[in-house]
């Protein structure tokens, strides 16, 4: 009986100490992690809107306005955040969106996209992707450049060579990845056309 009580006391002490250590580690690392995430987001915004001086969040995860893309049929994509891209004078140059496709071949594909007020897509910046090496992972080199400085209301991918502004050359052997990215970009464009141009307070 005495041994059982001793073992229980030792186990309790270990649990308390472990909990205290974990709590301490969390407190120590929480701020640096938050700062790192903030820097990563800033860099992602700056990459798709290089001439903007500031970014102001106008819609966060779970915002009711995101229902617009579901109504349009984009149920395999979600918008995590929408930010106004502003000049040094405070003028709104356009918007940056953080978008996630849930239709990748090997998981979610997350990226930022910047759109000017005239509807021009500055481009996209891939934030998270884990597709097949040599195939879907080529999205960075094959797909990303094709979205730069394009003006289209909706994109479509082709396997025979892009012949117009709204066509994107598919990654050879990775049409699932291609479709996932294209449809998620289209979801962002849909949100811009149906919600942002419709009067987000500027």
Roles of regions detected by a PLM:
Residues 2-202:
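Flexible, solvent-exposed loop/hinge segments and secondary-structure transition points
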């Amino acid at each position: 009986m005495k041994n059982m009580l001793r073992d229980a006391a030792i186990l309790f002490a270990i649990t308390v100490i472990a909990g205290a250590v974990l709590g301490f580690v969390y407190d120590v690392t929480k701020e640096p992690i938050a700062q790192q995430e903030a820097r990563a987001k800033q860099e992602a915004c700056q990459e798709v809107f290089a001439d903007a001086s500031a970014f102001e969040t106008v819609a966060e995860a779970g915002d009711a306005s995101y229902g617009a893309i579901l109504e349009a049929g984009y149920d395999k994509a979600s918008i995590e955040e929408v930010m106004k891209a502003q000049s040094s004078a405070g003028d709104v140059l356009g918007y940056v969106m953080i978008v996630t496709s849930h239709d990748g071949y090997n998981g979610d594909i997350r990226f930022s996209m910047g759109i000017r007020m005239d509807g021009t897509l500055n481009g996209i910046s891939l934030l998270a992707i884990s597709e097949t090496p040599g195939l879907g992972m080529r999205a960075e080199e094959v797909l990303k450049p094709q979205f730069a400085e394009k003006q289209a209301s909706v994109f479509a991918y082709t396997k025979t060579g892009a012949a117009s502004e709204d066509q994107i050359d598919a990654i050879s052997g990775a049409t699932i990845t291609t479709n996932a990215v294209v449809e998620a970009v289209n979801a962002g464009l849909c949100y811009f056309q149906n919600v942002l141009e419709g009067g987000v307070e500027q």
